[in-house]
């Protein structure tokens, strides 16, 4: 289940808590830009947190602080193309190639190398999207 939640952190945390109580299921907090509590609840319930180009914006310091709290095995990186292009492409049409910029900021934020964050987030993507063929 891919979830895009905006300005509804408390409701989303309550819904996830209630629904996962009926049985675990894979879910992804897509294009995450919410607060630390939703990230904490999502991870605690077995979900993944995916960071987009928003992570690279100068004013996204709080989001980078939240990223530091997400376990590596529960994070992904994404483009959200054609929207939310990372710095230095902000304001332009986003494209998949730009995900490398977001990955670089995520790697720096959590203190690992870019190659390591690429490996980890790729493995996480295959884990959550388990039917996706490895090419």
Model-flagged regions — what are they?
Residues 1-76:
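Catalytic pocket-lining loop regions of alpha/beta-barrel enzymes
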Residues 7, 58, 94-97, 112:
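Residue-level signal for the nucleotide or nucleotide-sugar donor/cofactor binding architecture
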Residues 15, 86-87, 128:
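Residues that scaffold the ATP/ADP-binding catalytic core of kinase and kinase-like folds
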Residues 26, 60, 96, 115-118:
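Short, structured helix-loop boundary elements
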Residues 30, 42, 80, 117, ...:
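Divalent metal-coordination and catalytic microenvironments
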Residues 49, 83, 127:
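Active-site micro-motifs of SAM-dependent methyltransferase domains
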Residues 73-95:
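Short acidic/histidine-rich active-site segments
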Residues 98-135:
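Mid-to-C-terminal alpha-helical segments outside catalytic/metal-binding sites
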